A protein has these predicted regions:
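Generic recognition of short, well-ordered alpha-helical interface segments
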Residues: 22, 80-84, 95, 128, ...
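C-terminal glycine/acidic-rich active-site capping loop/insertion
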Residues: 62, 91, 118, 123, ...
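Predominantly a Rossmann-like dinucleotide-binding segment in NAD(P)-dependent oxidoreductases
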Residues: 7-13, 18-111, 165, 250
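Conserved loop-to-helix N-cap of the C-terminal "lid" that shapes the substrate pocket in Rossmann-like
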Residues: 79-82, 203, 227-233
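Glycine-/small-residue-rich active-site loops that bind phosphorylated ligands and cofactors
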Residues: 19, 136, 235
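C-terminal helix-rich "cap/oligomerization" subdomain common to oxidoreductases
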Residues: 2-7, 198, 208-258
Length: 258
């Protein structure tokens, strides 16, 4: 796909949907501007619970395509939601994961697909972090939480509460940034369709990605953060492959391709 795209000179996008949220974009721009200082720690959690009701029932398990290797490939949890967590880490920080070490959970020995796992990552600039993804986190719905800690401050965003971006500073009350206010970046404001105080959600995030693609197709100026492109897609696939390999080879460190 990558070589075909380079020859065709067309536009390619991956719907890593959560990058379309205005406050996720604001988080990215604040980190780029140095609001946190040097990044010291990154923690991304993506927890769901829906497979917990499936994994213990053989009949349900047989009828769930994500748990069938012939339909979903080499991974369930990491391939389904772990890739979103991985992309969010790179999107908001601007860092690139260079190495990883994965420990996956299959619950039952005869289950061929991962349904839970932890991935230690080493990024550019020597930054270390962790990606935790689970589809057996009982009671969780769609809990994607991204936390980035720097020497000066920390930022946290929660997918289930996308209109809030939390700014954490030592010895100060937690700050809450919201969409639509003039203190936000142009990238964030461009993705905001309603006045402050009017909640926006997942369909708006999708629309922001499509809007960026439309600008690219029409040859209009656009910010590279408006939609994930081929590079993000290829890195996501490499992430899945290396996570599975790391676990299968005894939880060893694996390098990601640049």
């Amino acid at each position: 796909l990558k070589s075909t795209l380079e020859l065709s000179h067309t536009v390619f996008a991956v719907t890593y949907t959560y990058t379309g949220y205005p406050m996720v974009r604001q988080m990215s721009k604040m980190i780029e501007a140095g609001a946190l200082g040097k990044i010291q720690k990154v923690d991304v959690q993506y927890f769901q619970g829906w497979i917990n009701t499936v994994i213990h029932d053989e009949e349900k398990k047989k009828n769930t395509w994500r748990l069938q290797p012939e339909k979903s490939g080499i991974s369930c949890c990491m391939g389904d939601i772990g890739t979103h967590a991985f992309d969010m880490l790179e999107y908001v920080t601007g860092l690139r994961v260079e190495q990883l070490l994965a420990d996956l959970n299959f619950v039952y020995e005869d289950n061929k697909m991962d349904v839970d796992g932890n991935v230690l990552v080493r990024c550019t600039d020597g930054v270390k972090g962790v990606i935790r993804a689970s589809q057996i986190a009982t009671g969780e719905e769609n809990s994607l939480i991204v936390k980035v800690y720097g020497e000066k401050a920390g930022l946290k965003c929660e997918q289930e509460n996308p209109n809030y971006l939390y700014l954490m500073e030592e010895g100060k009350p937690m700050g809450v940034l919201k969409p639509g206010h003039t203190y936000n970046s142009d990238l964030s404001l461009d993705g905001t369709k309603l006045p402050p105080g009017h909640p926006e959600g997942i369909f708006d995030a999708m629309g922001n990605i499509y809007k960026g693609v439309a600008r690219a197709v029409k040859g209009e100026p656009y910010d590279k953060r408006e939609f994930p492109g081929m590079s993000a897609g290829v890195r996501g696939m490499n992430f899945i492959e290396q996570v599975i390999a790391s676990h299968a080879e005894g939880n060893v460190c694996k390098k990601l391709e640049n």
